[in-house]
Amino acid sequence: MTKKQNRRKTHRSRSAPNTHQRPKSKTSKEKHDFGKSSARTTNKGISGDVIEGRQAVRELLLAGKRKVREVIFLAGLDPSPVLAEIRDLAAESRVPVYEMARSKFDSIATTESPQGVVSFAEPLLNLEIDDLLSTKKKPFILVLDGIVDPRNLGAILRSAECAGVTGVLLPRHRSTKITPTVAKTAQGAIEHLPIASVSGIPKGISLLKEKGVWTVGLDTNAQTEIYELGVADEPLALVLGSEGKGLGRLSRERCDLIAKIPIFGSIESLNVSVAAAIACFEIAQRRR
């Protein structure tokens, strides 16, 4: 059995029995306010209630961790396996499915290329640091100090989930939230990564250290290379700074150690999402 088939089987075991054939999509009505029932108008946390893109919507339904209010398809899409799977998953979970003409669909979608699928769901749970540490695995937390580009944040979350990061810590201010662009770029990673937020990252680093987490900041000016770290067993947090500015002074001062990814070319630094991917996989390899 493939990994994908096993995940589908697990999803079905959690879902209510589906004794009917897949229902036909409903045609949208002008009076239906799509997404208005979502808590996004009152949610002050990390959001994530608007999901666009085929893989992101598929993972939302497959994870089954939060209520999905509706799935909306652009009318006239060519058939594909992933679209069929989204319809099947929606039917299994009794999620309403609608089809929309191009003009109305474009008025609801917010990303540049939603791939003909939009879904509205309950916002992501805004967790606490203690929640990130309550894991059966060795805690490996990614701390992001002010990422402002949604595509960068989405790419970082995708790489982090693939590398086995057990939780992510974000600041409540001066950082992008989990927008539709973040969710789409993350390709469903937000459904599997516990995400917490704090009022300030320096405070978050201090709280992690109080709870026995070793904190490593990533900075191009560090003396120690990331390949020299000994990170086998202890709970660990990897701290990355914002695009352009890097780690803030207070965040840097509160980390136990500052490390760098060595650069061998002429350009002095990597994109933050690329640096995050390299660092996460390097640490993950050392902790296996």
Roles of regions detected by a PLM:
Residues 216-271:
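Active-site/ligand-binding-proximal alpha/beta "capping" segment
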Residues 73, 81-83, 95, 134-223:
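RNA substrate-binding interface of SAM-dependent RNA methyltransferases
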Residues 63, 162, 184-188, 249-288:
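Structured adenosyl-cofactor binding patch, chiefly the S-adenosyl-L-methionine
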Residues 103, 123-125, 171-175, 244:
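Short glycine-enriched loops at secondary-structure junctions
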Residues 96-100, 196, 259:
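General small-molecule cofactor/ligand-binding pocket signal
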Residues 1-131:
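N-terminal positively charged helical leader segments and presequences
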Residues 114-118, 184-189, 232-236:
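Short, hinge-like loop/turn segments at secondary-structure boundaries
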